[in-house]
């Protein structure tokens, strides 16, 4: 018992390595994800439902697999300091493509529709409540049911209405797959 007390970090690393060694990426039956992001004077938290994989293609050789998995989500944004308005809600529907380059690593990208509860946020006018969400990221499958990732997202109305300053955010993601 004394050995475990003195070597907790080593024990934790070995346990995590063993858990990861058995993880294999498979098309999912769906899941939920939680995202926390930081932008220029604002932050965002998101809860997404990931549908089951709609489409999957296994490449030949060692090129991995490409999956299409839509994400339906709700986000809450809040501004730092006295920026006005100080908060806004967002709903989104984003088809995400995930390229599983091996058993555990993936690269993802997606573009989809989002709707904000206001056309102003954090001292910015965003032109319209409708915005496109552009996402690119990468991640790692920890266990067959758990994955983590890093994602960059850009939201703008693509010039449909002025002004169109866009909102950018970098997020840490955690997903529990069913």
Swiss-Prot record:
Traits of the deletion mutant: Increase in relative abundance of 3-OH C10 in lipid A. The most abundant ion detected in lipid A structure contains the addition of a 3-OH C10 acyl chain and a second phosphate group compared to the most abundant ion observed from wild-type lipid A.
Q: Where in the cell is it found?
A: Cell outer membrane
Q: Which InterPro entries match?
A: Lipid-A_deacylase-rel, OMP/PagP_b-brl
Q: Which SUPFAM superfamilies match?
A: OMPA-like
Report the transmembrane regions from the record: none
Oligomeric state and interaction partners are given as: Homodimer.
**What is this protein identified as?**
Lipid A deacylase PagL
* Organism name: Bordetella bronchiseptica (strain ATCC BAA-588 / NCTC 13252 / RB50) (Alcaligenes bronchisepticus)
């Amino acid at each position: 018992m004394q050995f475990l007390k003195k070597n907790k970090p080593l024990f934790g690393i070995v346990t995590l390595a063993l858990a990861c060694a058995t993880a294999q990426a498979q098309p999912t039956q769906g899941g939920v994800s939680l995202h926390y992001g930081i932008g220029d004077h604002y932050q965002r938290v998101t809860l997404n439902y990931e549908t089951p994989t709609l489409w999957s293609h296994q490449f030949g050789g060692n090129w991995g697999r490409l999956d299409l998995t839509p994400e339906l989500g709700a986000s809450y944004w809040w501004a730092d300091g006295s920026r006005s308005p100080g908060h806004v809600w967002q709903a989104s529907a984003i088809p995400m493509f995930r390229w599983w380059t091996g058993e555990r690593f993936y690269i993802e990208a997606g573009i989809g529709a989002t709707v904000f509860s206001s056309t102003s946020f954090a001292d910015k006018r965003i032109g319209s409540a409708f915005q496109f969400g552009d996402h690119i990221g990468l991640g790692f499958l920890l266990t067959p049911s758990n994955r983590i990732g890093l994602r960059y997202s850009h939201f703008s109305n693509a010039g449909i209405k002025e002004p169109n300053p866009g909102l950018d955010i970098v997020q840490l993601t955690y997903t529990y797959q069913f």
